[in-house]
Amino acid sequence: MASSKTFFLLFALLFALALLVSTEAAASEESTKTGSVEGVKDAVCHHGCCRWFHHRCVRCCRSAEEVSVSDTENNAAADAHCRHGCCRWFHGRCIRCCPSA
């Protein structure tokens, strides 16, 4: 009776350890994939992205001045959409309007 309990506890401990190791390996692999994708996105445009379509850059800015003009246009569009301006941007789009000025 005692040996079956010991065997069960040993089996449960080994199963939990294997599950923990596989979870850690999957998490580190996922972070590696995410890091490499972000690096690739940053390497696409030297001066930043001036036109986004479906969360992807479709046109790179030719110069740093063009980036500031593009940001100004985005702010104007967001101000027209949001009563108190845009508080949060994501990929060139306003995703959260400010609650008050």
Swiss-Prot record:
Domain of life, source organism: Eukaryota
Repeat region (Sequence), residues: 42-64, 79-101
Gene Ontology biological process terms from the UniProt entry: cell division; regulation of cell cycle
Alphabetically ordered keywords of this record: Cell cycle, Cell division, Growth arrest, Repeat
Region of interest (2 X approximate repeats), residue spans: 42-101
Keyword Ribonucleoprotein attached: no
Record-stated family: Belongs to the GRP family.
Function: May be involved in the control of the cell cycle at the G1/S start transition.
Protein name: CYC02 protein
Species annotation: Catharanthus roseus (Madagascar periwinkle)
Gene: CYC02
